[in-house]
């Protein structure tokens, strides 16, 4: 079972930002997420994020991942099934493995609430948006 100082659950902007700050301090850090970027992947054009000129959600997610990995942080794409508190930390069980950490950061993101309309997915980003500023 691998051990880390800090494990971060979620690889969206909050999780990767936390990972960058932790990894920059030379602290052993693992990000666990089912995917890279989370809901950022739903953003086709990103024009209102400081420092990102004419980008997209997936491009920003990849940029954050690259920055995190440049500080020797580790990332695993898996689903967290259970977190147990243990003496001196936490045990995190995923679909494929188990990890130990002294501390955890929960940044699991969110899933958009679908309206349940007929053909809703067909009109995603073509009139139906899940972003408050789109």
Predicted ranges, named:
Residues 3-30:
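N-terminal Rossmann-like FAD-binding beta1-loop-alpha1 element of flavoenzymes
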Residues 1-9, 37, 75-134:
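FAD-binding core/adjacent interface of flavoenzyme oxidoreductases
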Residues 41-98:
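N-terminal Rossmann-like dinucleotide/flavin-binding domain of flavoprotein oxidoreductases
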Residues 26-28, 72, 125:
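A generic structural signal for alpha->beta connector loops
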Residues 16, 37-39:
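Short N-terminal binding/cap micro-motifs at the start of the first secondary-structure element
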């Amino acid at each position: 079972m691998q051990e880390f100082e800090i494990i971060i659950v979620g690889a969206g902007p909050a999780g990767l930002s936390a990972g960058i700050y932790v990894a920059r301090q030379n602290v052993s850090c693992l990000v666990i997420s089912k995917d890279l970027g989370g809901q950022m992947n739903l953003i086709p054009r990103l024009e209102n994020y400081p420092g990102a000129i004419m980008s997209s959600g997936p491009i920003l997610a990849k940029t954050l991942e690259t920055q995190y990995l440049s500080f020797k942080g580790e990332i695993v794409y898996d689903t967290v099934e259970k977190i147990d508190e243990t003496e001196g930390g936490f045990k995190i069980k995923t679909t494929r493995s188990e990890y130990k950490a002294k501390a955890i950061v929960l940044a699991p993101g969110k899933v958009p609430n679908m309206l349940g309309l007929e053909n809703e997915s067909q009109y995603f980003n073509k009139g139906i948006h899940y972003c408050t500023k789109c």
